[in-house]
Amino acid sequence: MPIVNAYGITECSPGVAVNRLDSLTYNTVGYPIPCVEIRIDNPDESGNGEICVKGDNVMLGYYNDPQRTAEVLHDGWFRTGDYGNLNDKGQLSITGRKKNIIVLKNGKNIYPEEIEDYIMIIPYVNEVVVYATRDEDGNQNGLCAEAFVDQKKVEEMGITDVAKQFKADVFEALKELPVY
């Protein structure tokens, strides 16, 4: 049975986009389903912005919560809180969550999920989380990646200093990442 990536959220009953077997593209969740329109609001220089969805499948509002409804529904467009972009074929890629964005001192947006995807390429990493670090005054002063490793793979690969190897592998994996 073929398996493909798709994207959906509860407020959109739940389908929004799905890959098709005849046009799979790496790192996308595919094309909008037939009754759905997708637009990217306020895209940055790389095309990433908030994913907005319009269609018959979009909810009418949150039950007994008109304030929350007004925050996310505008002229029939639902603001998902997810960030992504559309490629030149119209396929959707998800890059992160609005509430997870880390804003650097230079004003650039960092999507921790994007960095995590690159780190997950490392064969002995099972899970990773990237987050902003803060100084004693609460000001952001850097990024940190914490990983959970597969100890069996570490042993099979003959790695004796996991921290040292992880640091080297992260720097290698992130060479493909855009410069922020």
Residues covered by each model-derived region:
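Conserved AMP-binding/adenylate-forming
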Residues: M1-L92, K98-I101, N126
